[in-house]
């Protein structure tokens, strides 16, 4: 996760806290120019997917994105995304043609990308695992949770 153009260390702390508790290999950083980050990603051979309500509908392009075999950067912008993002992105992808939240766009994209398999992911080093339940919250604290 990269939060460019900011130095808010609280963002880093929040993501790192989630990773400590729920596991996974997420990395987070703040700062730097968004343009430099995107251009560097592209020059290293990766692809950039920009989630917007103005792009190609997700169902029409997801197979192509998934089968590219390239490292993927997902850009989730808000209402004030610079125009250059649209021209730099490998794909401008719409999750709907109506206004939506950035986190909703990312969630919908990831669900399509992983084809629903994210419900069965097991993240290494998880201290907490969520157990599906028809009512209420159920979690398991793993042996790593006593660190």
What does each model-found stretch correspond to?
Residues 33-39, 56-57, 99-102:
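A short acidic, often aromatic-flanked loop/helix-cap motif at beta-alpha or helix-coil junctions
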Residues 134-147:
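Long, charged alpha-helical interface segments
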Residues 6-9, 80, 99-101:
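Gly/Ser/Thr-rich loops at beta-strand to alpha-helix junctions
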Residues 85-128, 134:
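Structured adenosyl-cofactor binding patch, chiefly the S-adenosyl-L-methionine
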Residues 20-22, 47-48, 67-71, 93-96, ...:
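Short, low-complexity, polar/charged sequence segments that are solvent-exposed and flexible
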Residues 55-95:
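Long, charge-patterned amphipathic alpha-helical coiled-coil/hairpin "stalk" segments used as oligomerization
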Residues 1-52, 114, 118:
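RNA substrate-binding interface of SAM-dependent RNA methyltransferases
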Residues 54-55, 134:
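Short, flexible active-site-adjacent loop segments at beta-strand->alpha-helix junctions, enriched
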């Amino acid at each position: 996760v990269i939060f460019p153009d900011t130095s808010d260390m609280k963002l880093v702390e929040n993501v790192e806290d989630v990773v400590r508790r729920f596991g996974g290999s997420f990395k987070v950083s703040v700062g730097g120019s968004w343009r430099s980050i995107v251009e560097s990603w592209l020059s290293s051979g990766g692809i950039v997917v920009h989630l917007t309500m103005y792009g190609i509908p997700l169902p029409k392009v997801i197979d192509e994105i998934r089968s590219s075999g390239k490292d993927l950067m997902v850009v989730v912008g808000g209402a004030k995304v610079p125009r250059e993002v649209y021209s730099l992105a490998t794909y401008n992808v719409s999750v709907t043609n109506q206004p939506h939240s950035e986190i909703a766009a990312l969630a919908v994209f990831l669900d399509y990308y992983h084809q629903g398999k994210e419900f069965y992911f097991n993240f290494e080093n998880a201290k907490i695992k969520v157990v599906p339940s028809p009512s209420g919250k159920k979690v398991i604290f793993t042996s790593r949770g006593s660190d």
